[in-house]
């Protein structure tokens, strides 16, 4: 692990190294700390998580890596969903706690943990973070009352994500209700040190200039949508025109054409895990997913 860490650490950008140093300093200080790493897709959050995890594990210490969804957790070494790892209730209220007892194995693991990384945090209801906060304050205060007065019981925790992407699902909720359900509307947010990643690393790996330019244009378009600039001024609703080169316009079987575009030569690659790691089809609703499947 030490050799792997040395390879990773020299590959960090200045931005990533700044975040890395801040988090590691908090761990060494042993007084806790809550961070939020704000970066859109492609800024290297996953690489940063890997570097932090390897740095800590190479010292024989424990880091828990979780994500808000199962798919996101697959990108993390030893990753699990936050709900599974911490026993977060599915039906949350403002007074919820996690199903972790003081004398349980999960409690013992948390006491020995040096760092918690929670990826894709913005998509989870704020009550989930507050439930974990209450639970850690309770579990970790046994033998040290001071921890009951420190966010997350004095553990260093790093949240990551992009508030321009998916926010918590509030059934039939208004814009205001959805925003109010977000992490940034929780009492926890006042304790978060926000660190930003702004450099798109995907623009540095392509060798073909035209490919880099195409990626840059697409990334800028996504950012415009996230910032609310793509559809003109609006109060939450907007009509956004999708570029022609992203549309399937002339096909008698659009779904078949989509699958062929995303999974070319599928039958020849059935035994190649990397082939499937590099591509996926996303849809906003289950009914669309079922239609494609």
Task: Name each model feature, range by range.
Residues 1-293:
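RecA-like helicase/translocase P-loop NTPase motor core
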